[in-house]
Curated annotation (Swiss-Prot):
Protein name, as recorded: Pentafunctional AROM polypeptide
Binding site for Zn(2+): E196, H271, H287
Record keyword NADP present: yes
Native source species: Verticillium alfalfae (strain VaMs.102 / ATCC MYA-4576 / FGSC 10136)
Catalytic reaction(s) noted: 7-phospho-2-dehydro-3-deoxy-D-arabino-heptonate = 3-dehydroquinate + phosphate; 3-dehydroquinate = 3-dehydroshikimate + H2O; shikimate + NADP(+) = 3-dehydroshikimate + NADPH + H(+); shikimate + ATP = 3-phosphoshikimate + ADP + H(+)
Region annotation Shikimate dehydrogenase: where it falls in the sequence: 1279-1574
Cofactor(s) recorded in Swiss-Prot or TrEMBL: Zn(2+)
Keywords: Amino-acid biosynthesis, Aromatic amino acid biosynthesis, ATP-binding, Cytoplasm, Kinase, Lyase, Metal-binding, Multifunctional enzyme, NADP, Nucleotide-binding, Oxidoreductase, Transferase, Zinc
């Protein structure tokens, strides 16, 4: 870095001395000499951070040494400290002081603080206290430090209680501002500093502010170039000017008020609120970003208090946003950076309470009175209530307007006229001074857009009240960046035609886009008209809405243009205004019926005339217009009328409250149709109206005296219908409003919105094709909306309901307060100042209004894929799992057409006709059966481009299009054998590979079936498919439950192939909550192979999957540079619905963004690993990685390397601090043997290994069992006691079962026997502190029920409890005891494990079952069979009365029937295929039962089914009933297996851990099982 010229740098005086030095390149060849000449010392101590040291310290040391003549010259000591706010601490200060003392520094030492604000603040405080004060110099390297923190002598360190709370005023001897440092400053840091530059101009110098406005594009363009020498050369002079200007302001203020007595407080403009935001959002939000938001909020506060005009607020906000700084918490960048963290208003006020400007409890805030001027020469005292209104998301309106009120309200400029004026002036030639321009979001979007198109230049005059716009006569250039228009419908429609006038520049087209609502608002008729006139326009979204790509062809052709104008008059105005610049004269013909909102078309014609273009209206057809070629001539001055739609709100308040309001600048001569509202609506409702050509005054009747309107046509003023509706709500009678059909496609469906929100007030409404009907209620019957009024982000909804709130019976909350900024940013100020209403801030945030939101979880599913891939099978599975009807579209097409598909193809229709009918059917079901169904499509559906468009649009709108595939060779083999469908006309494999990209394009999910076609046709959905459907369509409860656990684990699968490890996977996943597939360790990483591995893993593990590609640099095996393969594998994982994606934060931005955009229901684990141990948890070096992970992740994973045990404690402190700041879950670990403690203490989703795996995924990894044992030793897991209650129980195998499983999973619990038949003995045990759960057997299964707090539904129906589970209450330490029954679960498990499928929908015929016995276990068996879909269920017992008692106690839908004897068996319509015996087996079976059972067992069945007898007695192991069944060819299940199964379920309920069932079986049978998983 060197000086570019030999001139002396510029100096700025501060406190009477020229101590601030500013120029380019002074660090190396000027600072050393100045130090030696003017800041002499024997020792200079240069301190900087580790990021800057290597770049800037060695060359300075070289220059320093070169300037020292003798060995006796001064010495230079250098020190590097960690970067970031964490270094601004007592510990860092002590470290520096101790080091300086060790270097024998004395009182003549000079500290050189090289760095940003952290370095300057902290080193200044060191200088202030070292040896009672030594000299120091500031060398700021960031723009923020150059213009702010380095100037003024404020020094400080942070404490745990807050920032800058301990420090001193200590002036630097020199401040060297070398602008060359900014060449390497990252763009975000540079822009961060611009906030302080804007601040000083805003409070002190309007001229400098104007300079900042004018130079924003060039400054931002330069800053966004890659860092390095010459980057800022294009802005060299302006950069120096703005830094000098800002530094001079601060120096002048400090010189007048060094110790912050009053004037210096002005430098805190934006900081009172900004610091509060920063306190909650740091470190993710930078200081300048927080201050930028704070400036806007404090300016809005000044406007609310009546000391600042709205135009100044708008001007400030636009200047801030023009530099890329945020202006609200709703800014997309802020949401992304902070992970959407909320800032509760009460917490913000608490943070503001410790502001040093405050006077005791009185908060003081710097208020602007104009740009460049403050309200007072100090901070102003402001009440908390006013601050809360500005900070809150919603406004609480307390009703009560003085009945004597007579007020005058001037609404802002008309949005409609403002937008038209900007278009006309930009297309025109010359300069136009535009007065009363609306300062709102919509108009700002328009102004920004025409500037970006090069259509005009502009400046502000009269403190922002006048826009001076110079048009360029229609010379527009295409924009390389998309023009974002938010929810500005007017701007989007006008600009669609204007952009068609652009000529190519660096690009040959321009993209118009907007927010989510704008992307569903219609624009099709306008696009159709322009397309027909030769303009190339592409829809970039699924519907006929924005975003649009519009070709830059230098204008449209002209001639005759036909346009449908029944939806929006803005389509007409858009073409009219651009028509003079068409290549030929234009004849615009409006077709399709009566144009909507004719007054707005007339407004456009009148304004065009003012700007020099006369449109000729056809004498023969009033809906045809002739526009000659021409150029607009800008008038010298144009005044925007106030907005007539907005004027309806203050006039309506007068009407509803019985007061008087005058709008002084809207009258009968207005261009706007809504100006008729007072005469056409308010006067017939009973108001007194006085209207002149230029003003309107309304006086309302006494409150409650408004009259309903039997019918009013509001087509000329459709936007005003919302105002009329709220008045009608309290008017006598019923009001019918028509002519407003277009209001369904505005910012929201306004008719539906008004009906829903009026309903909250108890108002009855109805609607018809083009209107709404409102039945009024007396004022005293109005209800108060408990959850507030939801505004749909629609300004007119918010303002209308604020009118109704003025006469409510209790305060009303209007949600989404800031949406009024679209047309009247100061509306709430007007309510307070002009109408005297008491407003309060309400921190309510709107929830989702379900009726107007598409519930994607209920959307129909469309399945695509090759014939033979399993579409029909998986469709039936999915329909069963989701409880939806399934429709095979091939079969449906055959049904509707009355012919088979081969008949269609080989008949007159042919392939073309078949595809046409297939497409028509797809369109029909998408339109009419869009929710609650599962459809499978024909394999060739993707051959049709139109069908592909439908499928793509469906998935892009949130629908599920599922691609089903299995091994390609299996599909081919199947198709070669299938003769039921038309043969392919080409090679089957060629067909598949041609269609594969089409299937991928049309689908957003894919299921790879690992099961051969023959093995699944008649089965229940396999485990892998059930997991898949739960992941993509389920309620997410499985993952939510997992992540809510106090201790959760995932096992890292380190195998080269899942297929080769399927036998060991069930063992290694025990005790874990998820399984990590290390894709980088797989031998075959091709997409099809990985898809097969994912499906195989789901089958083997049955739990959520973490999909991980660990790169070489982060300790894995995947190549760091293979971005293409990485992205393709991530996309595959997302399409397969994996529950978690481990996404390394070192991937390029495009990978992170793509994965985030496509993630759907998958959760991102944003990870960073440091295998080389280069980062420290102690010094803040992990903070940037945490911040980056916070932007992208649902979970954050940070893995370091432990060099000492202390590293684990540092990690724990870091994690605690981060979790205190943000709720995003954090996995934070240290690798290595010394890091094991961090794994034990991690808690959330700890990665674990297992001895059965070939190797550990990371050094120091432990098993889940080892971690649980360690947690027990540390006291984090308490040993609990589990019991079996009953009598006799001495021979029970339950203790063996549960104690084996406790040991296996590393839990310290014990299970023992409590032999009793007395319920009161049980009552004492189950309330003991260490009680963990219990099993209950006879005779207590019924007796324990009154002792419990809750009993499950299944236990209630069965009438018996065999399991007691302690359930912690939310937010309470008191436990509730739940009684459940696992006997039936054990039975179901045993049946399923032997291959008995659920009968609920598995077959088209019914399947029956038989239960033998009449005791308590009989009831559990009946419940098990019912849950498995069997009906009827027959019962067989000796005592017929007992059977009748049982039958009567169950609901009738159980379909229970007593079986009388052998003869009755022959009369059964459906013979049982499952028998459950619940009678004792240690005694001979009753002969009559035996005879009947033998007949049942030998009865033939109509379908080929697995026939099973389940024995509930486990002594002896092989019973008489089992022998009978086996002799008849039935399969049998011994009772010991059911005992193991019900106990296995009990263990899961108690611990949340699912062990292997074979381990439970082994324990019950007394077989040897592993005693440990270590």
């Amino acid at each position: 870095m060197s000086c570019s010229n030999n001139t002396e740098p510029t100096r700025i005086a501060i406190l009477g001395t020229d101590n601030i030095v500013v120029d380019h390149g002074i660090w190396l060849n000027w600072v050393t000499k100045d130090l030696f000449d003017n800041v002499k010392s024997s020792t200079y101590v240069l301190v900087t951070d580790t990021n800057l040291y290597d770049t800037y310290v060695p060359p300075f040391k070289h220059a320093f040494d070169g300037a020292t003549d003798t060995t006796a010259g001064p010495r230079l000591l250098t020190l590097a400290i960690p970067p970031g706010e964490i270094s601004k601490s007592r510990q860092s200060k002590a470290h520096i002081e101790d080091w300086m003392l060790s270097q024998q520094c004395t009182r003549d030492t000079v500290i050189i603080a090289l760095g940003g604000g952290v370095i300057g603040d902290m080193l200044g405080y060191v200088a202030a206290t070292f040896m009672r004060g030594i000299r120091f110099v500031q060398v700021p390297t960031t723009l923020l430090a150059m213009v702010d923190s380095s100037i003024g002598g404020k020094t400080a360190i942070d404490t745990p209680m807050g920032k800058n709370l301990v420090g001193a005023f200590w002036q630097p001897s020199r401040i060297y501002i070398d602008l060359a440092f900014l060449e390497t400053l990252p763009s975000r840091e540079f822009i961060n500093g611009m906030a302080e530059v804007i601040k000083t101009a805003a409070i002190w110098d309007e001229n400098e502010f104007a300079t900042l406005e004018a130079n924003a594009p060039s400054i931002v363009a330069a800053v966004n170039q890659p860092t390095g020498p010459g980057r800022l050369s294009p802005i060299r002079e302006i950069l120096k000017r703005i830094v000098l200007g800002s530094a001079r302001v601060k120096a002048e203020v400090v010189s007048s008020d060094e110790r912050e007595g009053g004037l210096r407080n002005l430098l805190n403009f934006g900081h009172s609120i900004g610091h509060a935001y920063e306190a909650l959002l740091t470190p993710q939000l930078l200081h300048g970003e927080a201050v930028a938001i704070g400036m806007v909020k404090e300016a809005e506060l000044a406007r609310y208090l009546g000391v600042l005009r709205p135009s100044a607020v708008a001007r400030l906000a636009k200047c801030i946003s023009s530099y890329g700084l945020p202006t609200s918490l709703g800014d997309k960048r802020v949401i992304k950076l902070t992970a959407g963290k909320r800032c509760p208003v009460d917490i913000l006020l608490q943070k503001m309470a410790v502001d040093k400007k405050n006077d005791g409890r009185k908060k003081k805030i710097v208020l602007l009175s104009a740009i460049g001027k403050t309200h007072e020469p100090r901070a102003t005292t402001v009440e908390d209530a006013a601050i809360k209104v500005m900070l809150s998301a919603s406004t609480l309106i307390t009703p009560g307007v003085s009945t004597k009120l007579a007020t005058t309200v001037t609404p802002p400029g008309s949005k409609s006229i403002s937008n038209r004026a900007l278009i006309l002036a930009a297309l025109g030639e010359g300069t136009c001074r535009i007065k009363n321009l609306l300062h709102s979001d919509d108009v700002e979007f328009m102004l920004t857009a025409i500037t970006r198109l090069g259509g005009a230049s502009y400046a502000w005059e009269d403190a922002g009240e006048v826009l001076v716009l110079t048009g360029k006569g229609g010379q527009l250039r295409a924009s390389s960046d998309p023009l974002y228009l938010g929810n500005a419908g007017t701007a989007s429609r006008f600009l669609t035609t204007v952009v068609a006038l652009c000529s190519p520049a660096d690009v040959s087209s321009t993209v118009l886009t907007g927010n989510a609502r704008m992307q569903v608002r219609p624009i099709g008729p306008l696009v159709d008209a322009l397309r027909s006139n030769g303009v190339s326009i592409d829809y970039l979204g699924p519907g006929k809405s924005l975003p649009l790509r519009i070709d830059a062809a230098g204008g449209f052709a002209g001639g005759v243009i036909e346009l449908a104008a029944t939806v929006s008059s803005q389509y007409v105005s858009s073409i009219l205004m651009a028509a003079p610049y068409a290549k030929e004269p234009v004849t615009l013909r409006l077709v399709g019926g009566k144009p909507i909102s004719q007054p707005y078309i007339d407004m456009t014609l009148a304004m065009m005339k003012t700007f020099g273009v006369q449109v000729e209206r056809s004498s023969s057809d009033p809906n045809t217009y002739h526009i000659a070629k021409g150029t607009y001539k800008n008038p010298a001055e144009y005044t925007i009328e106030s907005d007539a739609s907005s004027a309806t709100y203050p006039l309506a308040i007068a009407a509803i409250t019985g007061t008087t309001c005058t709008v002084p600048n809207i009258g009968s001569s207005s261009l706007q149709g809504d100006a008729r509202f007072a005469i056409d609506v308010l006067q017939p409702m009973g108001c007194t109206v006085q209207q002149t050509a230029s003003s309107t005054t309304v006086t309302g009747p006494a409150p409650g005296g408004l009259l309903g309107l039997p019918h009013v046509d509001m087509e000329p003023m459709t936007d005003a219908f919302l105002t009329a509706s709220v008045l009608a709500a309290v008017a006598a009678g019923t009001t019918k409003i028509s002519g407003i059909a277009n209001q369904r496609v505005k910012e929201c469906n306004r008719i539906a919105a008004m009906r829903e929100q009026l309903g909250k007030f108890g108002i009855a409404t109805d609607e018809f094709d083009d209107g709404i009907i409102v039945t009024g209620q007396p004022l005293d019957t109005l209800k108060t909306p408990d959850a507030g009024v939801f505004c749909y982000d629609d300004h007119r909804v918010a303002m209308s309901f604020s009118v109704l709130s003025t006469v409510a019976n209790a305060p009303v909350t209007i949600l989404e307060r800031e949406c009024t900024g679209k047309t009247w940013p100061g509306w709430w100020d007007t309510l307070s100042q002009s109408f005297g209403l008491r407003l309060n801030g309400d921190d309510k945030h709107p929830g989702v209004e379900g009726r107007h939101q598409q519930d994607h979880t209920t959307r129909s599913v469309f399945i695509v894929g090759m014939r033979g891939a399993g579409k029909t099978t998986t469709g039936r599975w999915m329909a069963k799992l989701l409880k939806r009807p399934f429709i095979d579209l091939d079969e449906e097409l055959e049904r509707r057409s009355g012919m088979t598909i081969p008949e269609m193809i080989h008949g007159t229709k042919g392939w073309e006709g078949f595809r046409r009918d297939e497409l028509q059917l797809l369109h029909d079901v998408m339109e009419n059966q869009a929710s609650g169904h599962v459809f499978s499509c024909g394999g060739g559906i993707v051959e049709s481009p139109e069908a592909r468009k439908l499928l793509i649009a469906y998935k892009e709108k949130g629908g599920c299009v599922l691609l089903v595939h299995r091994d390609t060779k299996q599909v081919v083999d199947y198709l070669l054998q299938d003769k039921t469908r038309p043969a392919y006309r080409e090679d089957i494999e060629d067909v598949y590979y041609r269609r594969k990209p089409l299937y991928d394009e049309c689908s957003n999910f894919q299921y790879f079936s690992p099961h051969p076609a023959a093995s699944v046709a008649s089965r229940d959905a396999p485990l892998d498919f059930r997991c898949f459907v739960d992941a993509i369509c389920g309620d997410g409860s499985k993952v939510t439950k997992m992540t809510a656990k106090e201790q959760s684990f995932f096992v890292s699968l380190t195998v080269p192939s899942v297929d080769s490890a399927v036998d060991v996977i069930p063992q290694v996943v025990v005790g874990s909550d998820a399984v990590e597939l290390r894709v980088d360790l797989l031998q075959d990483q091709t997409p099809e192979s990985v898809a097969r591995q994912v499906s195989a893993l789901r089958s083997a593990a049955g739990m959520p999957i973490i999909f991980t590609l660990r790169t070489v640099s982060q300790g894995g095996c995947f190549p760091d540079a293979d971005h293409t393969q990485a992205l393709s594998l991530y996309i595959l994982a997302l399409r397969m619905g994996v529950e978690f994606i481990d996404l390394e934060m070192t991937w390029p931005e495009h990978i992170l963004q793509t994965v985030t955009n496509l993630k759907g229901r998958s959760r991102i684990i944003a990870s960073h690993h440091d295998p080389r141990g280069e980062l420290s948890w102690k010094n803040g070096s992990w903070t940037p990685f945490y911040n980056r992970a916070l932007q992208w992740g649902s979970v954050i994973k940070l893995v370091g390397t432990a060099q000492s045990m202390e590293d684990n404690y540092d990690l724990a402190r870091f994690k605690s601090d981060m979790l205190a700041s943000h709720p995003t879950p954090v996995i934070a670990l240290n690798m290595g043997a010394l890091g094991k403690l961090s794994r034990v203490l991690n808690g959330f989703l700890t990665p674990v290994s297992h001895p059965a795996l070939p190797f550990k995924a990371a050094p120091g990894q432990l098993s889940a069992a080892e971690i649980r044992r360690a947690l027990f030793l540390l006291g984090n897991i308490n040993a609990q006691s589990f019991h079996l209650f009953g009598k006799p129980i001495s021979k029970s195998r339950s203790p063996a079962l549960h104690n084996s499983l406790f040991n296996l999973t590393g839990l310290p619990h014990k299970y023992g026997l409590v032999e009793t038949d007395q319920a009161d003995e049980v009552a004492a045990v189950i309330r003991e502190p260490d009680f963990g759960g219990a099993s209950v057997t006879i005779p207590l299964k019924l007796d324990v029920m009154p002792l419990l707090d809750e009993v499950s539904e299944s236990a209630k129906v069965i009438g018996a409890v065999n399991t007691i589970i302690p359930m912690p209450l939310d937010g309470s330490q008191k436990r509730r005891l739940l009684g459940d029954n696992t006997d039936w679960r054990g039975m179901v498990h045993c049946l399923e494990s032997i291959g008995v499928a659920s009968e609920s929908t598995a077959s088209t015929t019914t399947a029956s079952a038989l239960v033998i016995g009449s005791g308590g276990t009989t009831r559990a068996a009946i419940f098990a069979l019912k849950s498995h879909g069997y009906h009827p269920i027959y019962m067989l017992a000796r005592n017929e009365q007992s059977l009748e008692t049982i039958r009567a106690s169950f609901p009738t839908d159980f379909d229970l029937r007593a079986l009388g004897g052998p003869a009755e068996v022959f009369t059964l319509a459906v013979a049982p295929t499952v028998v459950i015996s619940t009678i004792p087996a240690d005694k001979p079976m009753d002969p009559s039962l035996r005879e009947t059972l033998e007949v049942v067992l030998k009865s033939p069945v109509s379908e080929q089914r697995t026939r099973v007898l389940l024995e509930m007695a486990y002594q002896p192991r092989h019973t008489a009933a089992m022998r009978l069944a086996e002799d008849a060819g039935w399969r049998t299940i011994p009772g010991a297996e059911v005992l193991a199964a019900q106990g296995w379920h009990q263990f899961q309920m108690w611990t949340g851990i699912t062990p292997r069932f074979i381990d439970a079986q082994a324990a019950v049978n007394g077989d040897e099982i592993p005693t440990s998983t270590d």
